[in-house]
Amino acid sequence: MSNIRYISNLTRDTYALILAGGRGSRLYELTDWRAKPALYFGGKYRIIDFPLSNCINSGIRRVGVVTQYKSHSLIRHVTRGWGHFKKELGESVEILPASQQTSGNWYQGTADAVFQNIDIIRQEIPKYVMILSGDHIYRMDYAGLLAAHAESGAEMTVCCLETPIDEAAGAFGVMEVDSEHRVIGFEEKPAEPKSIPSDPTMCLASMGNYVFNTKFLFEQLKKDANNEKSDRDFGKDIIPAIIENHKVFAFPFSSAVAGQPSYWRDVGTLDSFFQANMELLLPTPPLNLYDAKWPIWTYQEQLPPAKFVFDDDDRRGMAVDSIVSGGCIISGAKVKRCVLFDEVRVCSYSFVKDSVLLPDVVVLKNCKIQNAILDRGCIIPEGMVIGYNHDHDRAKGFRVSEKGVTLVTRKMLGLPVGYE
């Protein structure tokens, strides 16, 4: 009981700041009209729901969501789905858009995004500030991270993950640690990451999740703000500047959720986004969205149930090994190994397999589609074939990823585009 009370005190003394202002340029047209944290995932969620759910499930009830790039759909989603917390009970999920709080500039980097909200954080009087990336899919109990931070006497703790060197090169900050997990070296997105001693093919990558003692964080942010040569970034500037003279520790993600398999995905490319969605279709997926003990919360629209119609020999409405969300209608068509978001319609004689269809997609009659991502609101014309010949896909103006996934958006189809 005393340990539970100790953890509870830590989470109550913590303010979480989720950095959700990034574009996600490697997702190309998928983020032309939305920030990466607002991108859909898993049939009914958005990426931002995962760090937010981790906070709530971990007992952290004071959260700020920092927004910047094309944030309309993100702000609307968080306001609708996460606006039920009561400030008078010490609970809140607040939107913190780039509003030039401390200067005439927009957020210049991750550290600047926190610095420009320093007065808002100060009003919460937290003992600890947790800074979280808003654009990854993962499950993590932050209470364990806070406990490790407090017990180690750290001034800053960095969440880390063993990652293949070829995946980390140019993509993640890479750390060196001693036998007690104290950080003794840090490089931001090196071309040639240093390997861990036990495995020359792996390195220790930063997940972009940090815990700071509040006073220490404020001191470092003010110091960085006065440095004209700084890029205002935690990975490039703050961490390298403090590891020599301050207590900075690494927290291994493998110990993030007791009794649960580790799950973390960077869905920052078309291929990784597609693969992470496809993994959910496995009989035992690496991410269990059906775990009642660790629910993923989101905004719930009032939609009718999914419907499958027609059972004729030549047109049978059916879906196999698929996720089919509310409001979908499969009308005399076959869907196989697909993730269908809300209100998707697939019309007679069409066959869609191994694909991700975002909300409000309509596939008209006699279409054949495979290995594709169809963006929200796409209307696929009758008889169109997608994913069977990459040269033909490119000739139609579609984008084909390195691993052969075809992306189709409304603009590529000649349909009107704009904010969601």
Swiss-Prot record:
<feature type="binding site">
    <location>
        <begin position="188"/>
        <end position="189"/>
    </location>
    <ligand>
        <name>alpha-D-glucose 1-phosphate</name>
    </ligand>
</feature>
<feature type="binding site">
    <location>
        <position position="173"/>
    </location>
    <ligand>
        <name>alpha-D-glucose 1-phosphate</name>
    </ligand>
</feature>
<keyword id="KW-0547">Nucleotide-binding</keyword>
<keyword id="KW-0067">ATP-binding</keyword>
<dbReference type="InterPro" id="IPR011004">
    <property type="entry name" value="Trimer_LpxA-like_sf"/>
</dbReference>
<keyword id="KW-0321">Glycogen metabolism</keyword>
<dbReference type="InterPro" id="IPR056818">
    <property type="entry name" value="GlmU/GlgC-like_hexapep"/>
</dbReference>
<comment type="subunit">
    <text>Homotetramer.</text>
</comment>
<dbReference type="Pfam" id="PF00483">
    <property type="entry name" value="NTP_transferase"/>
</dbReference>
<keyword id="KW-0320">Glycogen biosynthesis</keyword>
<protein>
    <recommendedName>
        <fullName>Glucose-1-phosphate adenylyltransferase</fullName>
        <ecNumber>2.7.7.27</ecNumber>
    </recommendedName>
</protein>
<dbReference type="GO" id="GO:0005524">
    <property type="term" value="F:ATP binding"/>
</dbReference>
<dbReference type="InterPro" id="IPR023049">
    <property type="entry name" value="GlgC_bac"/>
</dbReference>
<keyword id="KW-0548">Nucleotidyltransferase</keyword>
<dbReference type="GO" id="GO:0005978">
    <property type="term" value="P:glycogen biosynthetic process"/>
</dbReference>
<keyword id="KW-0808">Transferase</keyword>
<dbReference type="InterPro" id="IPR029044">
    <property type="entry name" value="Nucleotide-diphossugar_trans"/>
</dbReference>
<keyword id="KW-0119">Carbohydrate metabolism</keyword>
<feature type="binding site">
    <location>
        <position position="206"/>
    </location>
    <ligand>
        <name>alpha-D-glucose 1-phosphate</name>
    </ligand>
</feature>
<dbReference type="InterPro" id="IPR011831">
    <property type="entry name" value="ADP-Glc_PPase"/>
</dbReference>
<dbReference type="InterPro" id="IPR005836">
    <property type="entry name" value="ADP_Glu_pyroP_CS"/>
</dbReference>
<dbReference type="InterPro" id="IPR005835">
    <property type="entry name" value="NTP_transferase_dom"/>
</dbReference>
<comment type="pathway">
    <text>Glycan biosynthesis; glycogen biosynthesis.</text>
</comment>
<feature type="binding site">
    <location>
        <position position="107"/>
    </location>
    <ligand>
        <name>alpha-D-glucose 1-phosphate</name>
    </ligand>
</feature>
<comment type="similarity">
    <text>Belongs to the bacterial/plant glucose-1-phosphate adenylyltransferase family.</text>
</comment>
<dbReference type="Pfam" id="PF24894">
    <property type="entry name" value="Hexapep_GlmU"/>
</dbReference>
<comment type="function">
    <text>Involved in the biosynthesis of ADP-glucose, a building block required for the elongation reactions to produce glycogen. Catalyzes the reaction between ATP and alpha-D-glucose 1-phosphate (G1P) to produce pyrophosphate and ADP-Glc.</text>
</comment>
<dbReference type="GO" id="GO:0008878">
    <property type="term" value="F:glucose-1-phosphate adenylyltransferase activity"/>
</dbReference>
